[in-house]
Amino acid sequence: MPPGGVGVLNMEPGAWAFAGVAESLARALHVPVVDRPAHWNYCFYRPAGVDADSFIPAEAVRVASDKRLQADLFAGAGVPTPDTSLVADLAEARRYAQRPGRWVLKYPVACGAAGHRLLTEDTRLPKDWPKPLLIQAFVEMDRPEVYGLYGAAGRPFGWNVRRYRDDVPDPSPWVAHATGADYELLGVPPAGAVEAAAAALNVAGLNDSFGCVDLLPSPGGWLALEVGTDGPDAHVDRAVPQPLAGEINEQIHDAFWNWVSRT
């Protein structure tokens, strides 16, 4: 093995935000958490400009951190999604509120649905809201829920759904663990969901490493909402029930060490 070895890279000043997940994954991979790049790295926080050979490609991490980049890539590759547009300003965005159905103004660089809002003709935004603005059709459901599928080195796993308990008062339309939704593990994923997830991970550059996809059913088939992965801005939620929590680490373990053996 070359000098420098293998490690889970988690550097200052952002290491505190990823300490728990980095230590857990390091135990699963049987490698140390390191504060400087190793020869092979599973990267959580590293400052901009720090080069490291990373299991999850840096460009894929960048795509996963910005829903606008995903929207462009999904559209170009024909990944099935809800009707989505990037618009220059709020005046153009408000015109979507005049269309049939409801529309979402999605905050493009946050996780856990933070910042999302339903668009109206009276919508106001902070001056620092990132542009272009990301507009997406709101998929109406009798019971709000979002499905999820993970992928590691091209292998789909962990089919699940997030939904609110019946006793949750006034549930948020943004179905996320951060807004109080619970995970429920499911059985074999539908073929259409697997196909949509694989297409999304592939175009995002995550097919050979690790990522997850949020999905919704529609009359025309399964739709990909967004992809996520581990990186300096966020990490895939590990607060999931067993056996999924263990399976995430197992799947990453196998995919990571396969990458090490090939590079």
Language model segments and positions:
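Conserved N-proximal alpha/beta basic substrate-recognition cap immediately N-terminal to
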Residues: P2-R95
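Short, solvent-exposed loop/turn segments at secondary-structure junctions
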Residues: R62, A110-C111, E140-M141, P156, ...
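Active-site ExK catalytic segment of metal-dependent nucleases
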Residues: Q70-A71, K106, E226-D230
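ATP-grasp fold ATP-binding core
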Residues: F74, A97-A114, K131-D142, V161, ...
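Short secondary-structure junctions
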Residues: G78-P80, V203-S209
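Generic beta-strand structural signal
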Residues: L86, G151-A152, P217
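Phosphate-binding site of ATP-dependent enzymes
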Residues: H116-A204, L223
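C-terminal active-site "lid" helix and adjoining low-complexity regulatory extension at the edge
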Residues: L206-D208, P217-T263
